[in-house]
Amino acid sequence: MAKQKGPLKYVGTIGDIRHFKIKGQEGFFAGMVGGPTDTQVKTAPEFQRTRENMSEFGGCAKAGKSIRVAMSEVLNGMTDPQCTGRLTSIMKKINLEDGTEARGERKVEISTQRTYLHGFGFDKNISFASISYVPYLLNHSVDRLTSNFTTLTATPASSINAPAGATHFRYINAIGVVSDFAFNAATGTYEPTNPELNELSNTTYGAYSPLNAAYAGEVLDASLPVGTVMTADVSVLQCIGIE
């Protein structure tokens, strides 16, 4: 893919060259117009591998979207422009781990590959660790219905890397459920194996604390509905943040 570095900045097609912007990236890009028709991609034998890739990419995108939906309340204003793409990329890595299904129908089995998501930052430019230096503990209930986020005592002036002009801060603890995804031959698409639990979530907010006074610490519990039974094909995620 070519990238324009000259003084001309425009988008659109000139001759056989298409000029465009990519969200989250600087500069203007260019590529040749053309390629196979939609019908060719969908039916021609030589595009079988392309169809398989498209099918699995769609499943990975759906799985990534479910994570974003489950954590949507805490993610408001806390993601970078490439967050969606980065999550889809992780889902694809998980998808490639499946050795039980045919290519084009491989599962997105998050429940067996959870380590891929451990430590994922929704904003790669500003991490939680770069903002808060307050010691904390994370715990989870055996039934996977409650996530605990406990912060310890601290001096905010030296423990919180707050933006200029800020006077207060608060912590956020979120819990969310994401199902594994499998290809449904009847519909020709990927679907959650447990749609009832998929995207179930809850978010708890701490009290606003002043930056110029001692912080006593607090306990934030985020819980899912009592009586909910977590199955083996779902993963329960915990996300913490500060604002």
Which residues fall in each region the model found?
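Long, polar/Ser/Thr-enriched low-complexity segments
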Residues: 1-126
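Charged linear interaction tracts used for macromolecular binding and regulation
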Residues: 95-243
